[in-house]
Every structure is written in C-alpha cells, then in structure tokens.
Amino acid sequence: SCFIGGNVAENAGGGRAVKYGVTGRYIIGLEVVTPEGEIIHLGGKRVKDVVGYDLIHLMVGSEGTLGIFTKIYIKLLPLPAKKVNLLVLFADISTAVAVVPKIITFGKIIPTAVEFMDKTAVELACQYLNEHLYSGEVGAMLLIEIDGSDENQLVHEYEIIGEMCQ
C-alpha cells in the first residue's frame, strides 16, 4: 500500500508504467510547504499552463527535499472496460527477454504491463500458491497485460502478441 504524497515525492511508476507512465505525468497542480514554511501553489485546475518554469515537475520526484505536499491535483483516467492477462512460458530466459522489445517496438500495441519471472521465481510462486502452472521444462515466464474498451481489439492484440511469442 502507499499514499499519493509518497508516490508524487518519488515520481513512482509501478508495473503499469509501460502504458500509463509515472505519477508525474498526471499531476496538474500542487500546494507545497517549503522548508522555510512558505505555502506555494503550483499549477491547478487549468488544462494549459505554459508560462514560466515548470515547478510542478521540479517538485515531483524531489523526495520531499524541496517541500511537503499538502494538496495534490491529479488528472484521473477512466478505468479500462476490459483487461486481458497473458501468461507465456518460454524454454529459456534469453528467448523470453528477446520477445519484450518486439512487443514494445511493434507500435500498434502498448501493453499495460510486462512482468518477467525466471524459472526459480515461477517455482517459488507455484509452491507458495500450491499451484502447478506448467508441464515440461520452463526457463522463464512473461505475464503480459493489455487493456482497453473494445473486446474485439483486445482479442486481436493478444493474438498478435501470441504470434510474437512463438
């Protein structure tokens, strides 16, 4: 778990940064208490604010060294209507790793997240969950998430990703 102030202070990303980017991308305004005790207001509810220095993004990621956030204005996105998770097994690590740039640079598909697990991580996860996810020799696994509003488009995208993984 986390708090939004910490996310902004660290400019956190997380697993879905592949598609959605880091926290700073969505910060449109801040109220900050400076180390001197002064309260400053940066940005706000305006869509276009291009005059002067970009102090919002100077503060975002400053880890609290430039001030403490007391108000944060965030641009929110609607939740995607549909989500698909693909679990792809590979014989070895190098094959799994080679697929990731193919997917990312393909251009027509932006995965929400791409998570890599080597054989040891897969085995430990299976033990912990008391599950058996695969048969045969698996050297690595990718968990690829895609999301969107059009189910047919998602089906098309995961079929393309599946072909890239072969």
Annotate each PLM feature.
Residues 1-166:
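Noncatalytic alpha-helical scaffold of FAD-dependent oxidoreductases
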